[in-house]
């Protein structure tokens, strides 16, 4: 196992450098001149533009800019934002903890609720509960996220008053609970349907019939032989979904006025703030890489047939 982890860590190195190079190249190739646009209605003089470009190393060749960016990344010196006095690192440190907390809560919601409802639906395949949750999951998948957000805001926040309608500057568990449900709603539906299909299929498998013939209790058969095997594809989906949740929280953060990664990254893209865009997306790449590694390590725990040399 240790050799496998070491090998995967070595494989992550070229993936990381390749992804960051691609991101930097895409930002470098964006049309327009964000430096010239800093003056707004008034045009900046060529001398001022050259001075600003020199301060951001924009006067150097692309590969030199990229190497300087990597140097700053490894020394935690990400430079200044093009459209503000704050450093990129300060903005990143302020925004990422909020989105990480929101994404983990959304992941927990879709995992607990999706696996729970999917397990019941798979065991009772063809019954009224199975039909009901399948229809509801299709509705959740079909309805846009912002509609789900506004509906929950009105029902849970306004009519019932159970949860806050919006989040503050430093949102806690209560303020993030409803946004987490909205963010994880679509993934919850997919986890439910995936779990339901896997459980229903494993219930008719030969190894399950053999376990029952040996006299094992129903609970042991369900947990060890059915649920454990059914969770392998579910864990794959959840692991890949963590990065997608963090990168796709723009709509949810906008609905609930959350100052996280989504809104900050969207604003940086609109403004052409290259240092901000590159730094934020680089962290997202790291999240994807690490989450995929953790998923691979969980396989061996869930499926005894999987062994890493």
Label every PLM stretch briefly.
Residues 22-29, 57, 71-72, 135-164, ...:
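Membrane-water interface segments at the C-terminal ends of transmembrane alpha-helices
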Residues 12, 42-43, 138, 154, ...:
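Residue-level recognition of pore/gate-forming positions within transmembrane alpha-helices
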Residues 59-115:
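An internal, D/E-rich "acidic patch" concept
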Residues 26-30, 38, 42, 73-74, ...:
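Hydrophobic aliphatic residues
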Residues 15-67, 160-178:
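Hydrophobic alpha-helical transmembrane segments of membrane transport/permease proteins
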Residues 19, 23, 27, 149, ...:
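Juxtamembrane/transmembrane-helix interface segments of polytopic membrane transporters
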Residues 2-4, 90-129, 145, 169-309:
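Alpha-helical transmembrane segments of integral membrane proteins
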């Amino acid at each position: 196992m240790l050799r496998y982890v070491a090998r995967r860590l070595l494989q992550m190195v070229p993936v990381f450098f390749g992804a960051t190079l691609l991101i930097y190249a895409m930002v470098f190739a964006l049309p327009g001149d964000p430096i010239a646009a800093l003056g707004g209605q008034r045009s900046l003089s060529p001398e001022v533009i050259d001075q600003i470009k020199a301060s951001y190393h924009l006067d150097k060749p692309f590969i030199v800019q990229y190497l300087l960016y990597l140097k700053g990344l490894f020394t935690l010196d990400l430079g200044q934002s093009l459209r503000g006095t704050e450093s990129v690192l300060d903005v990143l440190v302020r925004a990422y903890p909020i989105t990480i907390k929101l994404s983990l809560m959304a992941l927990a919601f879709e995992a607990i609720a999706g696996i729970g409802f999917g397990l019941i639906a798979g065991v009772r395949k063809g019954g009224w509960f199975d039909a009901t949750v399948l229809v509801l999951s299709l509705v959740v998948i079909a309805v846009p996220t912002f509609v789900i957000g506004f509906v929950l805001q009105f029902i849970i926040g306004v009519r019932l008053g159970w949860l806050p309608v919006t989040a503050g500057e430093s949102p806690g568990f209560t303020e993030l609970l409803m946004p987490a449900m909205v963010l994880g709603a679509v993934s919850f539906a997919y986890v439910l349907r995936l779990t339901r299909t896997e459980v229903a299929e494993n219930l008719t498998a030969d190894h399950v019939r053999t376990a029952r013939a040996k006299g094992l209790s129903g609970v042991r058969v369900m947990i060890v032989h059915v649920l454990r095997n059914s969770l392998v594809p579910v864990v794959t989906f959840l692991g890949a979904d963590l990065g997608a949740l963090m990168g796709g929280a723009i709509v949810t953060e906008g609905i609930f006025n959350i100052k996280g990664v989504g809104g900050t990254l969207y604003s940086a893209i609109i403004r052409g703030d290259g240092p901000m865009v590159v730094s934020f997306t680089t962290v997202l790449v790291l999240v994807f890489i690490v989450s995929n590694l953790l998923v691979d390590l969980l396989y061996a725990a869930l499926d005894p047939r999987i062994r890493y040399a």
